[in-house]
UniProtKB/Swiss-Prot annotation:
It comes from Mus musculus (Mouse). The chain crosses the membrane at residues 46-66, 104-124, 290-310, 314-334, 694-714, 738-758, 814-836, 841-863, 955-975. The gene is Abcb5. The keyword Lyase does not apply. This is ATP-binding cassette sub-family B member 5. It catalyses: daunorubicin(in) + ATP + H2O = daunorubicin(out) + ADP + phosphate + H(+). SMART domains: AAA. Its EC number is 7.6.2.2. It is a multi-pass membrane protein. Keywords: ATP-binding, Cell membrane, Differentiation, Glycoprotein, Membrane, Nucleotide-binding, Repeat, Translocase, Transmembrane, Transmembrane helix, Transport.
Length: 1255
C-alpha cells in the first residue's frame, strides 16, 4: 500500500502541476515605453492629453518670456538710474524719466499678459491631464481585471494569486500617479527649458554655447541614474508584491494562523520581503537625489562660467551686449536649469509608473488558450447530455512530459448517473476538469452529443454544467445572491425552489433577514453544512444538463445528508450526472461505476457487477466495509429513515450569522467618522528614524538656502556693471563665478545627503508601519474579523496603499517641504533687508495663494477618504473573484464580477473628475498670481528707484529672492494632495493600531501551568456572537470531559458544535458561564499557552505557500523543528512515502493554499501538522472526510493512535467515525439534548437513534 500511495500521490502532484517550485517573476530593467504606457487612451483622451501638453508648453514659455521682459526692464532701470545719479554726464541723453515710466508700464502690461496666459493654460494642463489619467486608470483597472478573469486555469496554476491582488492596488496606483498631473508639469519644464535655451541662443549664441558645454555631463548622469532607478523600482515593486502575497495568505487563513500561534512566523515571512523592498528603496532614493544633485552642480558650474565669459564679452567690445542681454541670457539659462531639476522628480514618478505598467500590461496582453469571454464557437439548439471521451490523453501544461490521462475512453449516456472511483492520482478530478473545459486534452477529444466541446462556445457550454465541490465556495454577499450566482436572471421563485430542493429553505427562512442574510467572507458566517446546501441550491438553480458532484454531501450533518442525497438523486433525473466519490456508499445506486487507475479505466459496471468481479472496486469497497453497510441498510426500516418527526436538532438562528442593520450602521459610522490626524502626528511616526530625519532635514534646509544666496549674488552682479573699471569688474566676476560653483557643490552634497538619509528613514518607516499594521491585524480577535469591513481585500489594500501614502509624507516629502520653507523664509528675510516696501507689496498676494492651498488641501482630504473606501470595496470584489477563480469560471459569472467591480470603480472615477477641476484651478491661480506679483513688484520697484528709496541692486535681489520663494510655494502646493492622502491613510492606520482586541493573543499575562492534564468543563456556558447579540448560540450548556477521553459532538448544522471548539481555543469568550481547563477558567490562563495545548484538524485544511516541511513544522512555531521529527509525524499520518517520492521531497512547495496537492494529501499534511504539536487536547472536525477510500482506514488508525492519552473533541457529521468515542454529545438549540456512549444512546431510542437510522 505504501508503494501504491507513493506512486499515486506522485502522479497526482507531479503530473498535475509539474515540479513544485515557486513561480517567481524575473526582475530586471523592465518598463514599458514612454508612449506605450498611454495605450489605453481613447480619442477623447488623446485630445485632452494633446491640449494639455500644448497648454503646458505654452505655460512653460511664460517664465522664459518673462526673462526677456526682465532684460528690457533691467536696461531701462539701470540706464534710468545712471541718468538720475549722473545728470551732468548724461545731460544730452534722450531718455527722460517720463519715457522711462511709459516703458515700464508697457513692460508691466506684458507681465500681466503672461500671468493671464499662465492662469488659463495652467488650469487646462492640470485639469485635462488629471481627467485623462482618471479615465485611463479606470480603463486599465477594468481591463486588468477582465484579463485575469479571461485567463485559463493553467495560467492560475503558475501564478501567485496574492501578487495579482497586490498589483491591482499598489502597481495601478503608481501607474495612475505617473500619468496624471506630473506629465504636464514635466512637459511644462521641458518647454521652459527649450524656450529658455532658444531665447538665450538668440540673445547671445556665444554665451549660450559656453553654458551648454556642460549639457553632455548632465544628460549622461541623468541617463545613468534613470537606468538605476528603473531597475531598483522593479525590484522594490516585486518585493512588495511578494510581501502582499504573504499578508493576503495569512489574513485569509487567520483562524489557522491563530490556532497554531503562528503570528510571529507570518510576520517574519512578511518582514523578510519588506527588507528586500527596503534595500532596493534606499538605493532608488539615493540614485534619484544623486541625479538631481548632479544636475544642479553642473548647471551652477555653467552659471559661473557664463558670468565670467559674459563680462569678458562686454569689456571685449562685442557689439549688442548690455546688462539686459546678459540678464536675459542668464535668467533664461537659470530657468532652463531649474526646469531640468524640476523634471527629475516628475520623471522619477513617470519611470516608476512605466515599471509598474510593465507588470500590468504583461497580464493584460496574455492571450489565454481558453478565453472565458470568447464569443467564438457554435451554440447548439439543445444539449441532451451524451458524453464521450475518445482516446483522451492529457498532461498539465506545467509538466508536459508526465501523462495524467493515457488514452481514456469512456461513454456516458444522456440521463445516466456515472460514478468515478479510484485511488488518489488516478485522474478522476482531471477527467471532470476536462469535461468542464478548464483544460483541453493534448490528444483525443471529448464530445457532447457527438460535438467536440472545443468547437462549442465555451460560455454557453459551461452554462449547461452544474458543479458541487467538496469544499464549497460562497461569496461575501447575501444568501440569495449566492444562489442567484448559479444562473443569470434567476427569479425569486426559482431561487426559493432551489433552496427547498437542497434542504436549505428552512434554515434560511429562520434568519431574520432570510435570503438577504449576509454569509460573510468565504461564507464564514455559515456552518459547513449550511455552506454546502447553499452551494447545492446554486447548482440546482442552473437547471444543468450535466451535473458534476464531487463529494457533494460530505460536509452535511447526519440529519440532512440523506435528505440532500435524496434531493440530489431527484435532481439527477433527466440529467447526465457524474459523481467523483471517495465514499462508495453514496454511489451504490449509480447506473455506471467507472474505476480508474493510472489515468485509465480498469473496470466499469454497476455496483453488483463490480463486487462480483472482485477487482479493484471490490478492494476499495472492502476497505470501507461497504458490505457491512449494505447489511445495515437492509435492516433499517424506511419509516425511521423517512420520519421527519424529530425535526431539526437546533434552531438555525443559533448559527453564526451576519451583523444586524443597526450594527452595520454603527460600524459604517465608526469607519466614516475617524478622528482627524494632524501633520505633526504623521511626522511623529518617523521619530524612531530621527537621526536620519534630522540629518536629512538639515540637508534640505541647507539646500533651500542655495537659491536665496544666489539672489544676493545676482543682485551684486547687476551693480557690478555700474561705473567700475575693468580690473575691478574682472575680480568681481571671478569671485561671483567661484561662489556659484561653490553653490553647485553645496547642492550636490545636500541632495545626496537627502537621498541617503531620507531614503533610509522613508524605507525604515515604511517597513515599520507595514510590520506594525500587519502585526496589529494578526493579533486582532475573531470578532474583529467578523466585521465585513475587515475583509482580506480591504486589509491588504490598507497595507499596500495607506502606508505608501504616509511614508513619503513623514520623510522625503518633509524634506521637500523643509527645502521649500527654508527657501521661502530666507528669500522673504533677504527681501525685507534689501527692500521691505517692495517685499510687502509682493507679499500682499500671499493670502490668495494661502487660501488656494487651504481649499485644495481640504478638498483633497475628502476625495482621498472617498477614494480609499471605493478602492477597498473594489479590492474586496477582485480578491474574492481571483481567489475563487475555479468557482467563478464554473459558474460562468466572470461578467457578473466584472460588472460589480466596474460599478464600484465609478465612485472613485467621479471623485477623480471633480478633483481634476479643483486641482487645476488651484494650480493655475497659484502659478498666475506669481506673475501678477512680479508685475506689481517691478512697477513699484521702478517708482522706488526713481524716488531714490531703492537701488537697482536691492530691487533685483528682492525680485530674484521672491521669485524663488514663489516657486517654493508653488512646489509645496503641488504636494498638498499628497499630504491629504497621507492624513486619510494615517487616520485608518492609527485606528487599527489603537484598536485593542478583547482577547490579546500576544499578551504575556495569565497563568502558565507546568503541566496540562486535559480535563475540560463547560459550566453553564451561554454564548452569542458579538456581531449578532440577539441570537443565542449556546444556552446554559454544562459538560465535563475527563482527561484522555474522546468526546464527539453531533447535531445538525448551526447547533453550536464548532462554537464549542472555538470557545475552547478562546477565539471568543462566553457571555455567561465558564470554560475550564484542569479546573482553571481559560480566561485566567495565558492565551498562547492555552492554544499550545490544543491542535486542530479541520474539514477544509489550510496549507501555506511554502515547503511541505515548513507546513508540517507549522504545528509548533515555538522552536526549530528537526527534519527527523517532521518525518516521524508524516509517517504517522501516512504521508511520508508520498513525500519521499517527490523530486524535492520535503522541500517541495505546496503552492497557494496547497493547490499543488490533492484534497487527501492536504488533509494528511494537516494531520501531520497537528501531531507535531504534541497536544494534550486534539480537535478533529471531520478529519478524514477528504481522504480517498484507500487511505482513509490507515489515517483513521493513525488518528486513533495519536489521540491515545489525549483529550479529544470530535465534531462529527459522519456517525460511523465516532461510534468508538467514550462519550457522544447530541446538541440541540444550543444545549445538550442527550449524552452517552454509542450503545447507550441507541438503547435510549431518542434523537441519536433516529440520526443513526437516518444515516
Amino acid at each position: 500500500m505504501a508503494n501504491s500511495e507513493r506512486t499515486n500521490g506522485l502522479q497526482e502532484t507531479n503530473q498535475r502541476y509539474g515540479p513544485l517550485q515557486e513561480q517567481v517573476p524575473k526582475v530586471g530593467n523592465q518598463a514599458v515605453g514612454p508612449i506605450e504606457i498611454f495605450r489605453f487612451a481613447d480619442n477623447l483622451d488623446i485630445v485632452l492629453m494633446t491640449l494639455g501638453i500644448l497648454a503646458s508648453m505654452i505655460n512653460g514659455a511664460t517664465v522664459p518670456l518673462m526673462s526677456l521682459v526682465l532684460g528690457e526692464i533691467s536696461d531701462h532701470l539701470i540706464n534710468g538710474c545712471l541718468v538720475q545719479t549722473n545728470r551732468t554726464k548724461y545731460q544730452n541723453c534722450s531718455q527722460t524719466q517720463e519715457k522711462l515710466n511709459e516703458d515700464i508700464i508697457v513692460l508691466t502690461l506684458y507681465y500681466i499678459g503672461i500671468g493671464a496666459a499662465a492662469l488659463i493654460f495652467g488650469y487646462v494642463q492640470i485639469s485635462f491631464w488629471v481627467i485623462t489619467a482618471a479615465r485611463q486608470t479606470t480603463r486599465i483597472r477594468k481591463q486588468f481585471f477582465h484579463s485575469i478573469l479571461a485567463q485559463d486555469i493553467s495560467w492560475f496554476d503558475g501564478s501567485d494569486i496574492c501578487e495579482l491582488n497586490t498589483r491591482m492596488t499598489g502597481d495601478i496606483n503608481k501607474l495612475c500617479d505617473g500619468i496624471g498631473d506630473k506629465i504636464p508639469l514635466m512637459f511644462q519644464n521641458i518647454s521652459g527649458f527649450s524656450i529658455g535655451l532658444v531665447i538665450s541662443l538668440i540673445k547671445s549664441w556665444k554665451l549660450s554655447l559656453v553654458v551648454l558645454s556642460t549639457s553632455p555631463l548632465i544628460m549622461a548622469s541623468s541617463a545613468l541614474c534613470s537606468r538605476m532607478i528603473i531597475s531598483l523600482t522593479s525590484k522594490e515593486l516585486d518585493a512588495y508584491s511578494k510581501a502582499g502575497a504573504v499578508a493576503e495568505e495569512a489574513l485569509s487563513s487567520i483562524q489557522t494562523v491563530t490556532a497554531f500561534g503562528a503570528q510571529e512566523k507570518e510576520i517574519q515571512r512578511y518582514t523578510q520581503h519588506l527588507k528586500d523592498a527596503k534595500d532596493a528603496g534606499i538605493k532608488r532614493a539615493t540614485a534619484s537625489k544623486l541625479s538631481l544633485g548632479a544636475v544642479y552642480f553642473f548647471m551652477n558650474g555653467a552659471y559661473g562660467l557664463a558670468f565670467w565669459y559674459g563680462t569678458s564679452l562686454i569689456f571685449g567690445g562685442e557689439p549688442g551686449y548690455t546688462i539686459g542681454t546678459i540678464l536675459a541670457v542668464f535668467f533664461s539659462v537659470i530657468h532652463s536649469s531649474y526646469c531640468i531639476g524640476s523634471v527629475a522628480p516628475h520623471l522619477e514618478t513617470f519611470t516608476v509608473a512605466r515599471g509598474a505598467a510593465f507588470n500590468i500590461f504583461q497580464v493584460i496582453d496574455k492571450k489565454p488558450n481558453i478565453d472565458n469571454f470568447s464569443t467564438a464557437g457554435f451554440v447548439p439548439e439543445c444539449i441532451e447530455g451524451n458524453i464521450e471521451f475518445k482516446n483522451v490523453s492529457f498532461s498539465y501544461p506545467s509538466r508536459p512530459s508526465a501523462k495524467v490521462l493515457k488514452g481514456l475512453n469512456l461513454k456516458i449516456k444522456a440521463g445516466e448517473t456515472v460514478a468515478l472511483v479510484g485511488p488518489s492520482g488516478s485522474g478522476k478530478s482531471t477527467t471532470v476538469q476536462l469535461l468542464q473545459r478548464l483544460y483541453d486534452p493534448e490528444d483525443g477529444c471529448i464530445t457532447v452529443d457527438e460535438n467536440d466541446i472545443r468547437a462549442q462556445n465555451v460560455r454557453h457550454y459551461r452554462e449547461q454544467i452544474g458543479v458541487v465541490r467538496q469544499e464549497p465556495v460562497l461569496f461575501g454577499t447575501t444568501i440569495g445572491n449566492n444562489i442567484k450566482f448559479g444562473r443569470e436572471g434567476v427569479g425569486e421563485k426559482e431561487m426559493e425552489q432551489a433552496a427547498r430542493e437542497a434542504n436549505a429553505y428552512d434554515f434560511i427562512m429562520a434568519f431574520p433577514k432570510k435570503f438577504n442574510t449576509l454569509v460573510g467572507e468565504k461564507g464564514a458566517q455559515m456552518s459547513g453544512g449550511q455552506k454546502q446546501r447553499i452551494a447545492i441550491a446554486r447548482a440546482l438553480v442552473r437547471n444543468p444538463k450535466i451535473l458534476i458532484l464531487d463529494e457533494a454531501t460530505s460536509a452535511l450533518d447526519t440529519e440532512s445528508e440523506s435528505l440532500v442525497q435524496t434531493a440530489l438523486e431527484k435532481a439527477s433525473k433527466g440529467r447526465t450526472t457524474i459523481v467523483v466519490a471517495h465514499r462508495l456508499s453514496t454511489i451504490r445506486g449509480a447506473d455506471l461505476i467507472v474505476t480508474m487507475k493510472d489515468g485509465m479505466v480498469v473496470e466499469k459496471g454497476t455496483h453488483a457487477e463490480l463486487m462480483a468481479k472482485q477487482g479493484l472496486y471490490y478492494s476499495l469497497a472492502m476497505a470501507q466495509d461497504i458490505k457491512k453497510v449494505d447489511e445495515q441498510m437492509e435492516s433499517r426500516t424506511c419509516s425511521t429513515a423517512g420520519n421527519a418527526s424529530y425535526g431539526s436538532l437546533c434552531d438555525v438562528n443559533s448559527a453564526k450569522a451576519p451583523c444586524t442593520d443597526q450594527l452595520e450602521e454603527a460600524v459604517h459610522h465608526q469607519k466614516t467618522s475617524l478622528p482627524e490626524v494632524s501633520l505633526l502626528k504623521i511626522f511623529k511616526l518617523s521619530k524612531s528614524e530621527w537621526p536620519f530625519v534630522v540629518l536629512g532635514t538639515l540637508a534640505s534646509a541647507l539646500n533651500g538656502s542655495v537659491h536665496p544666496v544666489f539672489s544676493i549674488i545676482f543682485g551684486k552682479l547687476v551693480t557690478m556693471f555700474e561705473d567700475k573699471n575693468k580690473a575691478t569688474l574682472k575680480q568681481d566676476a571671478e569671485l561671483y563665478s567661484m561662489m556659484l560653483v561653490v553653490l553647485g557643490i553645496v547642492a550636490l552634497v545636500t541632495y545626496l545627503m537627502q537621498g541617503l538619509f531620507y531614503g533610509r528613514a522613508e524605507e525604515n518607516l515604511a517597513m515599520r508601519l507595514r510590520h506594525s499594521a500587519f502585526k496589529a491585524m494578526l493579533y486582532q480577535d475573531m470578532a474583529w474579523y467578523d466585521d465585513k469591513e475587515n475583509n482580506t481585500g480591504a486589509l491588504t489594500t490598507t497595507l499596500a496603499v495607506d502606508v505608501a501614502q504616509i511614508q513619503g509624507a513623514a520623510t522625503s516629502r518633509l524634506g521637500i517641504v523643509t527645502q521649500d520653507v527654508s527657501n521661502m523664509s530666507l528669500s522673504i528675510l533677504i527681501s525685507f533687508i534689501y527692500g521691505w516696501e517692495m517685499t510687502l507689496l509682493i507679499l500682499s498676494f500671499a493670502p490668495v495663494l494661502a487660501v488656494t492651498g487651504m481649499i485644495q488641501t481640504a478638498a483633497m482630504a475628502g476625495f482621498a477618504n472617498r477614494d480609499k473606501q471605493a478602492l477597498k470595496r473594489a479590492g474586496k470584489i477582485a480578491t474574492e473573484a481571483v481567489e475563487n477563480i475555479r468557482t467563478v469560471v464554473s459558474l460562468t459569472r466572470e461578467r457578473a464580477f466584472e460588472q460589480m467591480y466596474e460599478e464600484t470603480l465609478q465612485t472613485q472615477h467621479r471623485n477623480a473628475l471633480k478633483r481634476a477641476h479643483i486641482t487645476g484651478c488651484c494650480y493655475a491661480v497659484s502659478h498666475a498670481f506669481v506673475h501678477f506679483a512680479h508685475a506689481a513688484g517691478f512697477r513699484f520697484g521702478a517708482y522706488l528707484i526713481q524716488a531714490g528709496r531703492m537701488m537697482p541692486e536691492g530691487m533685483f535681489i528682492v525680485f530674484t529672492a521672491i521669485a524663488y520663494g514663489a516657486m517654493a510655494i508653488g512646489e509645496t502646493l503641488v504636494w498638498a494632495p499628497e499630504y491629504s492622502k497621507a492624513k486619510a491613510g494615517a487616520s485608518h492606520l492609527f485606528a487599527l493600531l489603537k484598536n485593542k482586541p478583547t482577547i490579546n493573543s500576544c499578551s504575556q499575562s495569565g497563568e502558565k501551568p507546568d503541566t496540562c492534564e486535559g480535563n475540560l468543563e463547560f459550566r453553564e456556558v451561554s454564548f452569542v456572537y458579538p456581531c449578532r447579540p440577539e441570537v443565542p448560540v449556546l444556552q446554559n450548556m454544562s459538560l465535563s470531559i475527563e482527561k484522555g477521553k474522546t468526546v464527539a459532538f453531533v447535531g445538525s448544522s448551526g447547533c453550536g458544535k464548532s462554537t464549542c471548539v472555538q470557545l475552547l481555543q478562546r477565539f471568543y469568550d462566553p457571555m455567561k458561564g465558564q470554560v475550564l481547563l484542569d479546573g482553571v477558567d481559560v480566561k485566567e490562563l495565558n492565551v498562547q499557552w492555552l492554544r499550545s495545548q490544543t491542535a486542530i484538524v479541520s474539514q477544509e485544511p489550510v496549507l501555506f505557500n511554502c515547503s511541505i516541511a515548513e507546513n508540517i513544522a507549522y504545528g509548533d512555531n515555538s522552536r526549530m523543528v528537526p527534519l527527523e521529527e517532521i518525518k516521524e509525524v508524516a509517517d504517522a499520518a501516512n504521508i511520508h512515502s508520498f513525500i519521499e517520492g517527490l523530486p524535492r521531497k520535503y522541500n517541495t512547495l505546496v503552492g497557494l493554499r496547497g493547490v499543488q496537492l490533492s484534497g487527501g494529501q492536504k488533509q494528511r499534511l494537516a494531520i501531520a501538522r497537528a501531531l507535531l504539536r504534541k497536544p494534550k487536547i486534539l480537535l478533529l472536525d471531520e478529519a478524514t472526510s477528504a481522504l480517498d477510500n484507500e487511505s482513509e482506514k490507515v489515517v483513521q488508525q493513525a488518528l486513533d493512535k495519536a489521540r491515545r492519552g489525549k483529550t479529544c473533541l470530535v465534531v462529527a457529521h459522519r456517525l460511523s467515525t465516532i461510534q468508538n468515542a467514550d462519550m457522544i454529545v447530541v446538541l440541540q438549540n444550543g444545549s445538550i439534548k442527550e449524552q452517552g456512549t454509542h450503545q447507550e444512546l441507541l438503547r435510549n431510542g431518542d434523537t441519536y437513534f433516529k440520526l443513526v437510522a437516518a444515516h
